[in-house]
Amino acid sequence: FSARPLTAETEKNMSLVIRQHTETQFAQELEELRKSDARQRPPNWTLSPWAVTVYLLGGQLDNGFEVTPKYIGNRRLVEIAVATLATDRALLLYGVPGTAKSWVSEHLAAAVSGDSTMLIQGTAGISEEQLRYGWNYAMLLAKGPSHDALTPSPLMRAMELGKVARVEELTRI
């Protein structure tokens, strides 16, 4: 077996992103909504509930900018989801596979927090402890159990920063 050197074409293709994070892919729309949104925002929200709804369902802004719809469906469901997030309650999107639950949650997180990457992928092997934090084992061995040895999970980071955390496949946990 001999390794062939990478060509410029191969290196270029390896650097391509398959799918950008939502807040990157739709950055222009989110920025236009931010600029034209003078409505009241809940604490730590980047957009008002009205703007989050427009971002998901699409529409034309006062300045003529067209926001593309991300969700084609019942408007009332989106309004209820956004209103729920504006309270101190959690939002559970429940349904059969292929009904855009992950898609909607990713866009909600991007519009509300400006960050859709606070994600925990549920598996049968994840414990309640792992939902909150992990351990830096090198630090744990060197210094023993301490705050420095803890590695915060996406859920813990979201709570510290006041952002939306998403848990995918909750029923597997």
Q: How should each PLM-predicted stretch be described?
A:
Residues 6-173:
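AAA+ P-loop NTPase catalytic core and its hallmark functional loops
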Residues 1-2:
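Long, compositionally biased low-complexity segments enriched in polar/charged residues
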